[in-house]
Regions:
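Surface-exposed loop/turn segments flanking beta-strands in extracellular/periplasmic regions
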Residues: 1-12, 149-158
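C-terminal beta-signal and adjacent terminal beta-strands/loops
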Residues: 86-95, 120-177
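Short, glycine/charged-rich beta-strand-loop motifs at protein surfaces that mediate ligand recognition
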Residues: 102-108, 115-119, 126, 158-159
Length: 177
């Protein structure tokens, strides 16, 4: 129960209710022979009792949306894939006032998008590929609160709700045995 006291990790039996309801819908459509589109949406309603109050679970995105497109050339030698992922915002644990009078962190984190893409060249028994993840370059602004003083009372390394790495690129070879 992080909302009770930011300096303590309280592990005890739940005194109240908790639940997790998820609704998901997805669809895939072949627009034409070589192009497949997929869309998905997931809505999360996750709550638990904190300090006697039924509240939204912290650090949990309210929704996630996904859209993918995959195109393979008619000869099957080239394939390009792209993904757009929308991550909904959510609640942060209860903030507190720092010694300088400012708030430790915002009450909520905002929604963000991520884009990834990959290009593949297929051969008879192997393939090569290049791609990138998090092409928008979005990262969580503050990943470790109080990082300048890891022994201080305001040090907090566990409030991760989004990407901590920026754009990443990769290349590789796949061998079919």
């Amino acid at each position: 129960d992080y909302d009770s006291d930011h300096r303590l990790i309280c592990i005890d039996n739940l005194q109240g209710r908790s639940y997790s309801h998820t609704f998901q819908i997805d669809a895939s459509y072949v627009l034409f022979k070589s192009l497949t589109l997929t869309a998905a949406y997931r809505l999360n309603d996750v709550k638990a009792t904190y300090g006697g109050i039924l509240r939204e679970r912290p650090l949990t995105s309210k929704y996630k949306g996904l859209f993918t497109a995959s195109y393979k050339t008619p000869d099957g030698r080239w394939q390009v894939d792209g993904t757009l992922q929308l991550n909904g915002g959510g609640r942060m644990p209860q903030p507190y006032q720092l010694a300088d009078g400012t708030q430790s962190w915002n009450r909520r984190f905002k929604a963000y998008e991520q884009v990834s893409a990959q290009l593949t060249r297929w051969f008879k028994h192997w393939s090569v590929y290049v791609g990138g993840e998090n092409l928008t370059g979005f990262t969580q602004h503050t990943t470790i609160y109080g990082a300048d003083n890891p022994w201080g009372t305001d040090f907090e390394p566990t409030l991760i709700w989004g990407p901590v790495h920026g754009r990443m690129f990769y290349a590789g070879v796949r061998v079919n045995i």
